[in-house]
Amino acid sequence: SPEVVKDLVSYGADFARNDDGSLAYTREGAHSHNRIIFHEDVTGKEITSTLLAQVKKLSNVTLMEYTTMVDIIERDNKCYGAIIRKQDGTLEKVTAAYTVMACGGVGGLYRFSTNFRHLTGDSLAIAKKHGIELKNPDYVQIHPTTFYTKKHEDRSFLISESVRGEGAKLLDKNMNRFVDELLPRDVLTGKIREQMKKDGTDFVWEDLRTIPRDELVSHFPNIIEHCKEMGYDVFKEPIPVVPAQHYFMGGVKVNHHSRTSMECLYAVGETACNGVHGRNRLASNSLLESLVFAKRAAGQMAELGFVNDEIAAKKATDSIDLADYSDEKAVEREYRKLAMEAIEGRISVGTEETVESGIAYIQA
């Protein structure tokens, strides 16, 4: 992982620094020490935008934006590429020596989630369809603090765990502190739910005024701005927060090189389950894990060589009728059903109320 961080810095990733120029570290829930490098309150965005800028410089890479993977091309448990749908709705078959699935998680299946709504577990559906092994599909994590809103259709806005790592306090309806804010996510989520039930409220309060103003402004500008847009001034008052689905620790089973049970098919990021997070991921570990295991996948593919069996690939592609995928809505319904079957409406790291709301939404 130190090499990955060095790579990012060399690409221009702008991580926070101390006065002496060394990397600054913050702390989040269940971490024993300050060990997390960061960029304001949008570290993930900084990493992805930096990597994307580097990719755009590569002459041997073709970026196809607004393009959706509809299915993989496979024959005899070997992947030969993917079927894609372009922005204008046209379908194409793309062959490849190796295919990597990086489809995100399952948050779009839940009523309350920090994920984008289009992340509905398509990789799980494709895996089930083609007999690719899955692992721990019930390992779904709840984040303790997202901004409370009555608009259920919106993506829940994350109030970063590092806010609590820097000193923010959680308060009940009477503005009394009721919990250790740096408990592991599952434990803290349970405590918040218990307090909400006790108070008869839909949220608890988070007070950021315990953080020095300069630190708030430099570290959490996006949170400050979002709260302002929602009518709250974090410098003068607490904000309402509530737990929501956040991260999928299960997924397509992969080995330590991110290879799936299907030959020439890899999976990375939230799509994959390599087991390193166990049942309850530590905050921010997923960013580094995604990069480390993606780099391992790339390294193995380069080592094995990019040689495609054109005859076998042709047989695989010829067996596919694109007309089977012409009804986009029908494909979406099929994949949502398969993804739902994969996770079975389960959610292991949360509370009874969250489980019931998740299952109710999935079954709707």
Language-model regions, residue ranges each:
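Conserved FAD-binding subdomain of flavin-dependent enzymes
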Residues: 1-15, 129-140
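Glycine- and aromatic-enriched mobile tails/lids
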Residues: 7, 16-27, 31-34, 164, ...
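Conserved redox-cofactor binding core of oxidoreductases
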Residues: 9-90, 102, 146-150, 170
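General beta-strand structural signal in soluble alpha/beta enzymes
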Residues: 15-18, 63-65, 101-102, 134-139, ...
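A glycine-rich dinucleotide-binding beta-alpha-beta segment and adjacent secondary-structure elements
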Residues: 64-65, 70-79, 83-85, 219-272, ...
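Core beta-strand elements of the Rossmann-like FAD/NAD(P) dinucleotide-binding domain
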Residues: 88-98, 260-264
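Glycine-rich loop(s) and the adjacent beta-strand/alpha-helix scaffold that form part
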Residues: 98-151, 157, 287, 291
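An anion/pyrophosphate-binding glycine-rich loop and adjacent beta-alpha core
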Residues: 126, 132-237, 300-306
